[in-house]
């Protein structure tokens, strides 16, 4: 792939290769900094613990740092040891180049690698959030409470990701007399992170039908209103519910006639009644608070066609554009006119045309014999697609985007949900290449405004032209190939801008 300004997509993961018995070989690599993410010229270090249990065999232990191309960068130490042994090696480092690197430790007997382990770490620009950036389009989905590790906000802050989409646990406050905000808000405030709260699921089975044929959730809606009152001056946008087609019993109580649970014919009418009631109760607290409706496929049309006064209850909508088996961001319908068509539909129905992407992502799970909805990608591809997807969707009409998700989940290496995260689910929450790519994207694109699409001669070359909202100067061009490499001849009017336009990262 041509490596052009503006996006840094890095390489491979920490990989363990075992040829002997795992219980006889121990390699632990621990970085001195949470997330294993460092700034340029920042001093860092790691401690490598190595244990070999076999007796009377001599090994070479090789400790080395390599770059994203697996090329040595100058640090390599070799130790000759007779087993059994337990050693600790201190590895200092400092880098002036942005990138994704990994520290490798190997046991060798003769010329044969008996056991090895690699752990990745990142060097990023200083994009640390020093204040809340509500205007930033860059967000990430997360399950902070599920992780059970509240250090994770420190890493998000360092990566410069301004927004987090996470559950608002209004049910936890039922029956309390609390008149202060949800403590999660204070926690995020300390890290200058903006919160998009998804109101926790309303159980479909709680609904009942009144004499006018309207489905009601009075108790749940009242409790949601109390929760919003707690946070009145701290949160001004909520997401109503997450994927009613999949959760909270909606498609079970009101199934689609042909079993197509994603489609709203069945659960759509009672769900519309619920969200309208949620909207009214929230507006009663503060008319400036916005409530996002889920807007997948024909959902909005169905809601609006089958219930009265729906348009007046929609502040704006959200979508979850996963690419599924069409692998590349540019081969999705979102590159070919979706936003234009969707916004024309919304405008025709007098519904605000703002659209947020509240979930999108690619997963690095390991495929098995079961065919799943999501195509597995390498960590290198995940990093590439993250940046390309943000650039594509933000250009064509997304207001904000939230990558799914921040941390990998412990569901097993063959489960797609385990691989969406950009941080590893380990004791140090170490960065994957996609996290480094995200930080570089924030650094390069936060204040770039798209002003045009690059018209390439080859259909598999893509790009956009930007102007900087904060600095005057010539436009910035960002281009890339779908999957391969190819030279592109670019006419440039201002040759003095070539240094900036042509600077290659990855």
Regions found by a protein language model. Name each.
Residues 501-506:
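Conserved small/polar residues in nucleotide/adenosyl-binding loops
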Residues 147, 177-179, 205-341, 367-388, ...:
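Active-site cleft segment of glycoside hydrolase catalytic domains centered on the general acid/base Glu
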Residues 454-499:
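Carbohydrate-binding surface patches
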Residues 140, 144-173, 183-187, 193-196:
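Catalytic domains of carbohydrate-active enzymes, especially glycoside hydrolases
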Residues 20-159:
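Mature N-terminal, pre-catalytic/accessory segment of carbohydrate-active enzymes
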Residues 136-142, 164-166, 195-199, 236-240, ...:
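Hydrophobic faces of well-ordered beta-strands that scaffold small-molecule active sites
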Residues 362-439, 454-459:
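Aromatic/acidic polysaccharide-binding cleft in carbohydrate-active enzymes
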Residues 141, 273-302, 348-366, 398-409:
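Aromatic-lined carbohydrate-recognition surfaces of secreted/lumenal glycan-active proteins
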């Amino acid at each position: 792939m041509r490596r052009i300004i503006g996006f840094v997509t890095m390489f491979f993961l920490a990989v363990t290769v075992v040829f002997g018995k795992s219980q006889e070989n121990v390699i632990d690599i621990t970085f001195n900094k949470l997330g294993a993410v460092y700034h340029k010229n920042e001093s860092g270090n790691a401690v490598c613990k190595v244990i070999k249990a076999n007796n009377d065999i001599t090994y070479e232990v090789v400790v080395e740092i390599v770059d994203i191309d697996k090329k040595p960068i100058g640090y390599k130490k070799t130790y000759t040891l007779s087993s059994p042994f337990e050693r600790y090696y201190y590895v200092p480092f400092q880098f002036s180049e942005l990138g994704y690197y990994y520290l490798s430790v190997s046991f060798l007997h003769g010329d044969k690698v008996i056991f090895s382990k690699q752990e990745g770490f990142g060097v990023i620009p200083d994009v640390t959030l020093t204040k809340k950036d509500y205007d930033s389009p860059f967000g990430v989905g997360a399950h902070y409470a599920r992780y059970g590790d509240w250090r994770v906000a420190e890493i998000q802050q360092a990566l410069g990701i301004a927004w987090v989409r996470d559950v608002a646990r209004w049910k936890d406050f039922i029956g309390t007399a609390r008149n202060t905000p949800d403590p999660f808000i204070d926690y995020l405030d300390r890290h200058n992170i903006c919160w998009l709260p998804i109101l926790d699921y309303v159980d479909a089975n709680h609904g009942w039908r009144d004499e006018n044929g309207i489905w009601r959730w009075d108790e749940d809606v009242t409790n949601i209103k109390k929760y919003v009152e707690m946070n009145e001056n701290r949160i001004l946008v909520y997401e109503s519910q997450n994927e009613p087609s999949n959760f909270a019993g909606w498609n079970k109580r009101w199934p689609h006639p042909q079993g197509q649970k994603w489609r709203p014919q069945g659960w759509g009418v009672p769900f519309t009644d619920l969200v309208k009631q949620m909207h009214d109760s929230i507006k009663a607290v503060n008319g400036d608070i916005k409530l996002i409706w889920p807007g997948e496929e024909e959902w909005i049309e169905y809601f609006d066609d089958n219930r009265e006064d729906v348009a007046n209850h929609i502040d704006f909508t959200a979508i979850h554009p996963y690419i599924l088996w069409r692998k590349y961001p540019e081969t999705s319908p979102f590159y070919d006119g979706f936003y234009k068509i969707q916004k024309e539909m919304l405008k025709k129905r007098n519904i605000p045309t703002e659209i947020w992407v509240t979930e999108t992502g690619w997963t690095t799970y390991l495929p098995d014999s079961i065919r799943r909805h999501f195509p597995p990608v390498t960590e290198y591809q995940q990093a590439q697609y993250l940046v390309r997807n943000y650039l594509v969707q933000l250009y064509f009409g997304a207001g904000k985007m939230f990558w799914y998700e921040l941390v990998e989940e412990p569901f097993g290496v063959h489960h797609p949900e385990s691989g969406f995260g950009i941080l590893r689910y380990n004791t140090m929450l170490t960065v994957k290449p996609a996290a480094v790519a995200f930080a570089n994207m924030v650094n390069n694109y936060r204040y770039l405004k798209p002003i045009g699409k690059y018209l390439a001669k080859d259909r598999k070359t893509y790009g956009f032209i930007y102007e900087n909202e904060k600095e005057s100067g010539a436009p910035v061009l960002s281009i890339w190939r779908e999957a391969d490499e190819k030279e592109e001849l670019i006419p440039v009017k201002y040759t003095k801008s070539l240094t900036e336009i042509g600077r290659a990262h990855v």
